[in-house]
């Protein structure tokens, strides 16, 4: 019996996961409670009770690789090994927590922070960043540009760097690494007395389990909520954002509805003060007015420097007192202070266009505008079964 146990221990090897965070089969027994100070972070709860995610491996490997064991896994032959990294360190595992130096306390007085993320194997095509906590300084309130605190993800051959700031707890992003070996996370922090906290789960994802091409964010499930970056009561949508939010079409689902999370959940002011144009443009797909509709489409694009794109082929607006829309009506471009035309809230937009994608296109916002009119977007979605 002793020989058998010894043999099992000698041949025990690390279980290697390369799947999205929500699908990880995680083993952990210790509950971690962080007391988080209030202040600029009023959207965060006082007490956070959470079981950390980790990789099931033997105790020796966990210790040698710099991890910390949190309970047992694999019938007691392994431990749930949790890896944490902070500034000026490297990530060399497929699941690592990147935290501020004083975590779980707030960090003050830093000017910079950097992290390298090494791809662990050639099959990894994307790196997923889950912002469990992400509270940095706000962008310029009038322009939306991240001027003081900047969080940037770069790679040698990446086509575009991700740059964000502000409050992004609960958000996530996928970054393609198919043709590169490492990513760099660079944070530039202002010298102002701003309290900051971040806790980011970094996961390495194989090609078969990642997001579709061109999707910075990827949501699954019949129901869910999507938001633009830095969407908060005292926030402002960020400038220079150009990406797609993608939603997986679930089995036996043929269409999707979008509804603002609350009455102020869609506020993206247009460039012009001209109110004679409906920025939530109703453009007929065919008919005698097609040329006029095309001209109006270009005018809407010109007006909406900051805009949301909801692709559609047959779209229905469901609003109180509005039942006379022609078949095939399509609201492609959305900006202004309401998701629906003429401010007829509450409303739902239903679309059968696939894939279920939302385009976020925010310009450089060189012209100062009211931050209250540029909170950004928060939408609840629901997929509708096929008839």
Residue ranges of model-derived segments:
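Domain-level representation of secreted and single-pass membrane ectodomains enriched
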Residues: 2-387
């Amino acid at each position: 019996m002793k020989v058998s146990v010894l043999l099992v221990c000698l041949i025990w090897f690390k279980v290697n996961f390369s799947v999205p965070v929500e699908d990880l089969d995680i083993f952990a027994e210790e509950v971690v409670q962080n007391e988080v100070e209030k202040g600029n972070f009023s959207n965060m709860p006082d007490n956070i009770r959470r079981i950390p995610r980790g990789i099931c491996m033997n105790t020796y490997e966990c210790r040698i690789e710099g991890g910390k064991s949190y309970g047992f896994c694999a019938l007691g032959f392994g431990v749930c090994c949790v890896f944490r990294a902070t500034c000026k360190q490297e990530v060399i595992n497929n699941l690592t927590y990147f935290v501020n130096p004083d975590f779980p306390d707030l960090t003050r007085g830093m000017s910079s922070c950097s992290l390298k993320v090494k791809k662990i194997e050639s099959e990894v095509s994307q790196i997923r960043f889950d912002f469990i906590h992400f509270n940095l300084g706000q962008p310029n309130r009038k322009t939306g540009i991240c001027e003081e605190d900047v969080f940037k993800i770069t790679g040698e051959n990446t086509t575009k760097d991700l740059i964000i700031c502000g409050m992004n707890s609960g958000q996530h992003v996928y970054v393609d690494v198919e043709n590169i070996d490492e990513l760099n996370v660079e944070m530039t922090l202002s010298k102002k007395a701003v309290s900051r906290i971040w806790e980011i789960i970094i996961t390495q994802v194989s090609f078969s389990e990642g997001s579709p091409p061109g999707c910075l964010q990827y949501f699954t499930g019949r129901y869910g909520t999507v938001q633009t970056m830095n969407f908060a009561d005292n926030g402002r949508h960020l400038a220079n954002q150009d990406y797609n939010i993608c939603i997986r079409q679930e089995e036996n689902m043929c269409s999707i509805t979008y509804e603002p999370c609350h009455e102020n959940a869609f506020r993206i002011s247009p460039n012009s003060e001209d109110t004679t144009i409906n920025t939530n443009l109703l453009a007929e797909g065919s008919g005698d007015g097609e040329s006029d509709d095309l001209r109006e489409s270009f005018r809407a694009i010109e007006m909406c420097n900051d805009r949301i794109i909801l692709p559609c082929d047959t779209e229905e607006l469901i609003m109180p007192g509005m039942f006379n829309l022609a078949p095939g009506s399509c609201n492609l471009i959305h900006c202004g202070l309401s998701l629906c035309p003429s401010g007829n809230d509450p409303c739902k937009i239903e679309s059968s266009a696939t894939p279920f994608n939302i385009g976020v296109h925010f310009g450089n916002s060189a012209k100062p505008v009211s931050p209250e009119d540029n909170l950004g977007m928060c939408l609840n979605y629901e997929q509708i079964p096929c008839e």
